[in-house]
Design a protein with these regions (language model features):
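Predominantly five- to eight-bladed beta-propeller fold
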Residues: 2-9, 55-56, 141-186, 288-291, ...
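A short beta-strand motif characteristic of beta-propeller blades
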Residues: 17-22, 69-72, 115-118, 192-197, ...
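Beta-strand-rich domains and repeat architectures in extracellular enzymes and scaffolds
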Residues: 20-56
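Conserved beta-propeller blade repeats
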Residues: 25-40, 75-93, 114, 119-136, ...
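Short loop/turn segments that connect beta-strands within beta-propeller blades
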Residues: 62-66, 108-112, 187-191, 233-237, ...
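Active-site-proximal cap/loop segments of hydrolase catalytic domains
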Residues: 468-661
Length: 661
């Protein structure tokens, strides 16, 4: 699909170090285009060297990239911009000082200061205006034992925690018990708030029906591993749930007349989703597609929102997805289920916002050569433009890695991969090679900015990132090949991709390393027990012992059964066979283990077990623990921790792969 790219050359290029990237790259995100298509509101995030903390503000820009300006000044973090139906007011969430620092604010677009509507201790999410502009729906965490968010006395001991539900904790949120996200209705006139939903399950991403009488939201069960569509009566709060409890819901949208809902989901969690139509009058739920060619952008729990479908007319919807690692737009016929590609890019886009005419589509943009900008697709002209240049100067003075996309055939499947090279790559030289393994296992690499690979390439290494069987964006069949086969054919795919790179004269087969996080951490810990070909390994937040992971991870009891084919009692022999812990005594590779201490997804105990096993074996091993770090610490952890993480990863590999750059 792609060949080696060209890069901007600077006379004296700066090093693409973790510190430089994290402090100096800015990120434009969450774009929202006004109803008339004349203005785009978005969030611009950056990190201050003075405070060592991230901040974000609401900006506005014209669709052609002109007249960019900052709208917010008060507060340190702003998010969730949402236009009123008439386009005259912009709602957003602002973090400010005080015991209840999170405010929903309204900014009149014809001039004047933002008005605080209501404040909360927790961060409101998913702002959505009612069709008549009188009310904002949002989501807030509600603790049934402390619904008014009353502060505990400073000298009071922590309360005793009594647990009766299996999903009592969640990564990036910590201990929950019955605290769950609920839909709230806030008066845009006076800030009066009403709790609409009450069942102790998470309700997210509320969408109003065209007549304003019903809200469609996502109900998440078992920490988001399963989800359903919930139709909530605005007057009474009564809830109708659509779809099986063991199913999944990815994206959804009301039809223009409110008679049906188009949604992307599946009857059970099988790593891939398809489109359905739910007719409100008849209650019929009809499958429209079977085995989509792309993966929908369904968002990531606690981090990002889904890219919801938008209507082009009464029948055809436009949706965003990712196929073979590349973002694109497709149309879905809500009657026939016919799918047609509109455009595809060698880039990764996020979100999906359009004006009332559905001609201009604005999304956040990232590629292998840049990141943090906004892209506008003109549907009538068929043209895509990057309308911001926040990081242009950064990449002019700090050239990104060169790259090459390639693929191999193995076991009847095509395995795609990307090779990253130093920006000043010399084909007559000799370079160590690092195998970079993604998480998931249904994650994927593709056409997005990969900071880890960029840092390693800048440090003088070749980095090969691939999508072995089990990866997402290649269809249902490919994704499901990893189920019940962790460390099997996927491992052999990775080795085959590495061997392909090592055939090149500039790749040094005597200096190979492996790096991975989450499922990539599993594969790294698996690798060092299977072979001694790697001279260095970096293992981030691994699954090391399947049996203990099952009972201690926030999703192990559900995800584990789906992936491994049953409970430990049913699959113990297989779990022992496929656990890296079983083979750790064979390891010889110098290994760095990096792990967040508050990781509830792959708990710190997995890293602890691995460290002890390797230490007892006599391996040169180091264990780095990040206090307070969740499984998502690389996306939103303390700035100093993220810089430390990427620096240690690079330094460990440079040391043991003899990189003298």
């Amino acid at each position: 699909m792609a060949t080696t790219t060209t890069t901007i050359k600077a006379e004296a290029p700066s090093r693409l170090t973790p510190e430089h990237a994290i402090y100096d790259l800015r990120t434009a995100a969450t774009p929202r285009i006004s109803p008339n298509g004349k203005r785009i509101a978005f969030v611009l995030g950056e990190t201050s060297r003075e405070t060592d903390k991230p901040s974000s503000h609401i900006w506005i820009i014209d669709p052609d990239g002109a007249n960019a300006r900052q709208l917010t000044r008060t507060g340190t973090s702003h998010s969730s911009p949402a236009w009123s139906p008439d386009g005259q007011t912009l709602a957003f969430v602002s973090q400010r000082d005080g015991a209840k620092p999170n405010a929903i604010c309204l900014l009149p677009m014809d001039g004047g200061e933002a008005r605080e509507l209501v404040r909360h201790r927790a961060m409101p999410g998913s702002l959505a205006w009612s069709p008549d502009g009188s009310t904002l729906a949002c989501t807030l965490p509600v603790d049934p034992e402390n619904p008014r968010e009353e502060e505990r006395a400073k000298d009071a001991p922590p309360p005793v925690r009594v647990v009766r539900r299996i999903d009592y904790k969640q990564d990036n949120r910590g201990f929950l018990n019955d605290t769950r996200m609920q839909v709230m209705l806030v008066s845009a006139e006076n800030g009066e708030i009403r709790q609409l939903t009450r069942e102790a399950v998470d309700h997210t991403e509320p969408q109003w029906s065209p007549d304003g009488r019903t809200i469609a939201a996502k109900v998440s069960n078992r920490n988001g591993m399963h989800s359903q569509l919930a139709l909530v009566d605005v007057a009474t709060g009564a809830v109708e749930v659509v779809g099986p409890e063991d199913g999944v819901l990815a994206t959804w949208a009301w039809s223009r007349d409110g008679s049906f809902i188009l949604f992307d989901g599946e009857d059970r969690n099988i790593a891939y989703t398809d489109y359905f139509r739910y007719d409100l009058a008849s209650g019929e739920r009809r499958r429209l597609t079977d085995d989509l060619p792309f993966s929908s952008e369904s968002g990531f729990p606690t981090i990002s929102s889904p890219a919801q479908p938008v209507w082009l007319d009464d029948r055809i919807a436009l949706v965003h997805g990712i196929e073979h690692g590349a973002s694109g737009l497709w149309t879905i016929d809500s009657e026939s289920g016919d799918v047609a590609e509109v455009v595809q890019w060698e880039a990764t886009h996020a979100g999906l916002s359009t004006d009332l005419s559905a001609n201009l589509i604005v999304q956040a943009w990232s590629s292998l050569e840049g990141t943090g900008e906004l892209a506008v697709f003109d549907r009538a002209a068929g043209e895509t433009r990057i309308i911001t240049s926040f990081n242009e100067a950064f990449f002019a003075e700090t050239p990104p890695a060169k790259w090459e996309a390639f693929s191999i055939q193995r076991g009847g499947e095509m395995i795609e991969a990307w090779l990253f090279m130093p920006h000043d790559f010399d084909p007559t030289g000799s370079y160590p090679v690092v195998l970079d393994v993604h998480g998931g296992p249904h994650g994927n690499y593709g056409y997005s900015f990969n900071l880890g690979a960029q840092v390693m390439a800048d440090a003088g290494m070749l980095v090969v990132a691939s999508n072995p069987r089990g990866s997402g964006t290649y269809g249902r069949h490919f994704a499901n090949l990893v189920r019940g086969d962790w460390g099997g054919e996927d491992w052999l795919d990775l080795l085959a991709v590495l061997d392909e790179v090592l055939e090149r004269p500039y790749a040094d087969a005597d200096r190979t390393g492996i790096y991975g996080y989450s499922y990539g951490g599993y594969m790294t810990s698996w690798a060092i027990g299977q072979t001694d070909r790697f001279k260095a390994a970096v293992c981030g937040a691994p699954v090391f012992d399947m049996e203990s992971f099952y009972g201690t991870s926030d999703i192990g009891h559900d995800f584990g059964e789906e992936q491994w084919g049953g409970t430990p009692q049913e699959r113990m022999a297989w779990m022992i066979e496929r656990s890296p812990a079983t083979y750790a005594h064979k390891a010889k590779t110098p290994t760095l283990i990096v792990h967040g201490e508050a990781d509830e997804r792959c708990p710190i105990g997995q890293g602890e077990q691995m460290f002890v096993a390797l230490k007892k074996t006599g391996v040169d091993v180091e264990f780095v623990r990040y206090p307070g770090g969740s499984h998502l610490m690389l996306r939103g952890g303390p700035v100093s921790h993220r810089i430390d993480y990427y620096t240690r990863v690079s330094d460990w590999l440079r040391k043991y792969l003899a990189v003298d750059r």
